[in-house]
């Protein structure tokens, strides 16, 4: 049965509440140039219709609270509801209020920064970026400012990325004005060291790496990679997408990374999906600290304050001070678990991934880069099966599918990340479902799913001819 849009439920004149007339009228207080000439085209519905509409939509959603969600490279772990209670405690704060009246909030931000520096081995940090890709761009702009300050901005115009990198890495470098060159992976799925040596030189600004990489493998030669970058004057950038595998056990700063961005909405249990809000703090080594965005939260003799006096800063990268309530949730997560708890979470994430990998291999799936997996792995179906069909079939069986067709270096890739919060029984049930799909008739797979609210979309048409508004014009 089709589900009507909220605009299709609208009936002229229906209201869910009656607004009290303002005295004086609001329009008398607002400059005329800021007033609408015509009323906004909002749906007109009563309260019950509104409640039923959004309750109905919520029952059609799939999320980590409803089913197993092994979306590779996304760390869809459970988000404790206690953190929502903590976030509500700060609901009445306003970013324009005097910092002297928001000492608790500033203290939380400062403490979170200290925790993240300790976990990553960085010397300074900004909490301002609002997402992972936003953090990436901030980090690369910091590197650009550093090279420009040294008089090398015009010569170092290249950023290196592995062929297994997240797509946001080359996009970020390009947005920052750099040329992007790809470094191939070796036969074991790690960076090809000889290829890297050929590319390094005085023309290179940075190398962007994820460790563990997107194949779920730890870059075992990371110290050698770091040494080569240092000798060439190249800044080593850490994409924190996969920090969940090593938090508390290993620190990017100790591996030689100069910049790191984190995804609080992945590693530190801030709910994500649907466009945010996210949080992508950026940590740097001391030589890059002068270029961090303003303001930074600092602690002085009279309490905590916002430091804008940073002449070499790249400036603001977001209004106000980041997605603050995301920071509250991450702070609560770290304070709840402590260092030993974080280490256990990382260890369980790795254990779950390795166990599930072996289960899928028993069901007939291949793992082309079958080294010691960390928090995730990339599998392939047997010959003749399409990753897309298997993903759609999983929806019919009640599971969210893994990431498909990424990384690009694996054909028909199924990128699986179970996270630490899933039980052994859940992993086994998922493996059984994956095995059952291989026994389904080809026609069944090609037409799945059957019982979801929306079946197969015309994805090509949706990309080429998107309809982004309900209204025709």
UniProtKB/Swiss-Prot annotation:
Pfam family name, one: GcvP2_C
Needed co-factor(s): pyridoxal 5'-phosphate
Record field: catalytic activity: N(6)-[(R)-lipoyl]-L-lysyl-[glycine-cleavage complex H protein] + glycine + H(+) = N(6)-[(R)-S(8)-aminomethyldihydrolipoyl]-L-lysyl-[glycine-cleavage complex H protein] + CO2
SS bond partners: none
EC number: 1.4.4.2
Keywords recorded for this protein, A-Z: Oxidoreductase, Pyridoxal phosphate
InterPro entries recorded: GcvPB, GDC-P_C, GDC_P, PyrdxlP-dep_Trfase, PyrdxlP-dep_Trfase_major, PyrdxlP-dep_Trfase_small
A GO biological-process term: glycine decarboxylation via glycine cleavage system
Keyword Repressor: no
A single GO cellular-component term on record: glycine cleavage complex
Enzyme class: oxidoreductase
Keyword ATP-binding: no
Residues with PTM N6-(pyridoxal phosphate)lysine: 266
CDD domains: GDC-P
Recorded GO MF terms: glycine binding; glycine dehydrogenase (decarboxylating) activity; pyridoxal phosphate binding
SUPFAM superfamilies: PLP-dependent transferases
Superkingdom of the organism of origin: Bacteria
Gene3D superfamilies the record matches: 6.20.440.10, Aspartate Aminotransferase, domain 1, Type I PLP-dependent aspartate aminotransferase-like (Major domain)
Biological role: The glycine cleavage system catalyzes the degradation of glycine. The P protein binds the alpha-amino group of glycine through its pyridoxal phosphate cofactor; CO(2) is released and the remaining methylamine moiety is then transferred to the lipoamide cofactor of the H protein.
Family of the protein in this entry: Belongs to the GcvP family. C-terminal subunit subfamily.
HAMAP family documented for this protein: GcvPB (MF_00713)
Subunit structure, as described in the record: The glycine cleavage system is composed of four proteins: P, T, L and H. In this organism, the P 'protein' is a heterodimer of two subunits.
Protein name: Probable glycine dehydrogenase (decarboxylating) subunit 2
The organism of origin for this protein: Thermus thermophilus (strain ATCC BAA-163 / DSM 7039 / HB27)
